[in-house]
């Protein structure tokens, strides 16, 4: 898909190209609802009239949002006609156009917004973390333990710990509460004891991706409490639309609850603030789009909610952009930016460096720092 326009302004968008980006994974990214072995994403490339190139990555995750690579490409094809010929400096107006053209395709919006912002920042030689506020250039991420059996959980957690990860996000909700409790307990018991000084830093986060009923979620928490398994946070225990269930779990749980699928817009976050139903909210570019995510951040901060920065099954480009946002804004208690580590092969070169748990953005010269090798 390619379109062009000729103009005298160096900031005018002259081309926009969208291509399938298939990223094989080292293992299926199994959650409640699906287990893709390949991330079928989309690469967006915009060119300004002065030749500046910006790149974006859209990462639709069918199991969570219903979006597909095909629907994302179609949405971007429709958006392209409205975007080419516009001035890249009008980023908010361009975001509004994308919301109008593809309201039900947040991954498409996010990928295009990232490409436009990358082009703008490269033209002005500004790193993305600076654009978002410049709070920091370093982050420490957790690592996801995907859904599976007990041996897989133990082996994955031990390998993650050896690689330097002390925060683990454990996917639950694909099995019964009893089976998940057994798996989480075995995982925890298999990690080093208090003799290891790093064990004091260990954090376990559960993520059900809406796979439980309220009764099942509470059953899991009771089983883990009885087994004396410390849980730092329980993310999205029930389905997005089950607000009563979310209220029920939050009121009866001693473990803090985090909303993910239940928080797709600033309006959703406002409801969470007003009801005090959760203690934290997970922000994802692909779930909401870039500028809606920024609005959600402001509402959550004003309302006193804790913050997690997460993602769908994203490659190095989209993950780097999310890292820039979290580092630049600051205020995030939980960082879940690990899916690029599950990608076995990709076409990118990145100045945004991820060494296991550690993100380092200081070496990024402009934009998000990711190019096609």
Model regions and ranges:
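N-terminal capping/lid subdomain adjacent to the active-site entrance of alpha/beta enzymes
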Residues: 2-205, 209-218, 225, 252, ...
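Structured loop/turn residues at beta-strand edges in well-structured enzyme cores
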Residues: 11, 163, 229, 276, ...
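C-terminal alpha-helical cap/extension of soluble enzyme domains
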Residues: 42, 313-371
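Short secondary-structure boundary segments
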Residues: 57-58, 172, 285, 311-312, ...
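Short glycine/serine/threonine/alanine-rich loop segments
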Residues: 85, 126, 255, 305, ...
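Short glycine/serine- and small hydrophobic-enriched flexible loop segments
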Residues: 118-122, 298-301, 323-327
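Catalytic core of soluble alpha/beta enzymes
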Residues: 175-320, 344-354
